[in-house]
Amino acid sequence: MQLNNKVARAVLLLGIIVTLPCVPATAQQGRGGRAPDQSLPLVQQAFKMTDARYLISFSRYCMLDGPNTANGKGDAATPSQLFDNLYYVGKTDVGAWVLRTSGGLVLFDTLNNPQEAASIVVPGMRKLGLDPDQIKLVVLTHSHNDHSGGMPYFRAKGLRVMVSEADWGPLGGAPNADSVVHDGQIVTFGETSITFLLIPGHTPGTIAAMFPVFDRGQRHVALLVGGIGPTGGVDMHRTVINSIAHLSAATKQAGVDVVIDPHEAIIDSAAWGYIMHPQERKTNQNDLIVGAERFQRFTQMLSTCMQARVVMYQQKADAAR
């Protein structure tokens, strides 16, 4: 997947910045006694943790106005099988996934509205040989409309929908206790267990889900992230930093080595390209498998970028005084 021009320029600019040698703060001081940029050492540190797959995340999260690749203008994507038991039935800019278990199907996210649920998700499932009537649970990773908008279509069919308590608020409130996701909660269908994590910051109740996937019979552990980008200022960034620490610890213990990106190339451009272009996939190569160590390094990079942004916000506020 090619980076768009805005992303490419951002990556080039940040590459120049972070490859500058670290010099004493007094030497970095500009003309007129301007204070040095205290965020630069953190940005440089984050850059050392990244690699080509995560440059898009680095460019997005290591500056205040990083490129936004999720533009809400996507079309229906080609439905495809990602693993033996995981399928994609979303759009080109935002995802919907189906996990197949021996106890039925689990749908993650529902696109923008009931019309997209009916015209994209359901036909996509049928094209892949999945029966929509076998859906046992619908999970909304968070309350933003591009993930939850199709929920009424599935609730009208009497399906169980699960959302975190905090994110049920914008959706009209939880209908019952069984509809609320709790941190560390495990839901099991057949032989498949799904572990939920609360990772607030993108919304007050964003969740992530961990579950086993199989690639030609080989077991892996996948993480489906609802959203990690903060939607607010310093306080929300600090919340995200805590959420990343929680995510890192839980995924390390679980051995997560597969990461599912919620949007177009927000986390990993190679992974999204793999999802979008099934006809270009190479035999015996699944680009969604990143490895446990690589993912842990990514969480460290992301946390460091968020710390840098906190410093940027503080410097911006100080400069305005």
Q: Model-derived features: where do they sit?
A:
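Conserved beta-strand hairpin/beta-sheet module of binuclear metal-dependent hydrolase folds
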Residues: 72-128, 208-230
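Sec/Tat signal peptide C-region and signal peptidase I cleavage site
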Residues: 23-27
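Metallo-beta-lactamase
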Residues: 105, 112-114, 177, 186-188, ...
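Divalent metal-coordination and catalytic microenvironments
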Residues: 85, 99, 109, 142, ...
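Bacterial N-terminal signal peptides
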Residues: 11-22
